[in-house]
């Protein structure tokens, strides 16, 4: 379909989004103040209970407390932790709530596991109005903004047929330079640049970050066939549940370099397939000797295998489909490097455990502590855990380890022959 003007394209996109899981009602021309009130209304509906808002709405002062926390965090990386942390604390200043007045309460803002369920809300804001830093510039208007539970998390810029998608990327970059993605709009995690024949998506680099076209990605299907047409792209990536999962599971706040990352389509396909495989595993004793095949993460050099393997492990751990996920390395230096990367990818409430020696590894494999779920070790250390009496292990220890549901992710498995 050929679009001679951008408005026709925008009309059709906005009409299509409700067919893939977004709400029918569209927020037209909302500025930050109106979007903040919309967020307040959703927070109230999702937190009316006696232990939270006690059926008394949020005041402007309480919403400003939340907005100040957003402004203080500032970067998309830290705000990713805010969103996926699931809750926010405020001090009640609504005098009508005599039970909580002057006290701190916790409000639920988002649950990445409540996908198209529970209290999740999916809204479309059309032509959102941005305030710019400079007094001599007019305030900006975006094309389409997608909100989850009132938070703007995906911003879309459109261009008509015949206009390169790079111009939509440039428009996003221009808005960022003018200070449009600050305040409430700094919650945006992912940008989408789209014309009818091509679409790109990329992580928000933040106010001090750099827009790098090397990290503007095309989406692709399971067979890595590119999905360029706007309608197929919308159905695949911007639909619910996928958009919810993209924000909750397939963005990575990398503390090692301070940059928010979004996974490429092949990384998503691999991590999702691995997690799905583990969810269908049969752990009963009669099935353990059966031919339950695993799989390979088949990426080229430099294409993000480490992130894919970590995200696979994180998904498995989050789903509780295994008790332990063990990253096996065939060289000590690889283990040290990978441990650093995995810890960079890990969220604030996640631990990635090192194993200084075989005894430490054995202790973590026996442990029931949630902090000991993700473990990095070497094939050499793992191969040492075989016999009773070695490394202080007794029959009960070995049996305890055997009773665990353990998933192994082997780095460079094509060349790992030891053990």
PLM feature spans:
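Short, charged, low-hydrophobicity "junction" segments
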Residues: 347-360, 409
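Conserved motor-coupling elements within RecA-like helicase/translocase cores
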Residues: 358-375, 400
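Short beta-alpha junctions and helix-cap segments that line functional grooves
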Residues: 312, 341, 357, 361-364, ...
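Conserved RecA-like ASCE ATPase "motif II neighborhood" in helicase/translocase motors
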Residues: 374-412, 416-419
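Conserved helicase motor
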Residues: 332, 354-364, 379-384
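ATP-dependent helicase/translocase motor core
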Residues: 1-324, 329, 333, 337-349, ...
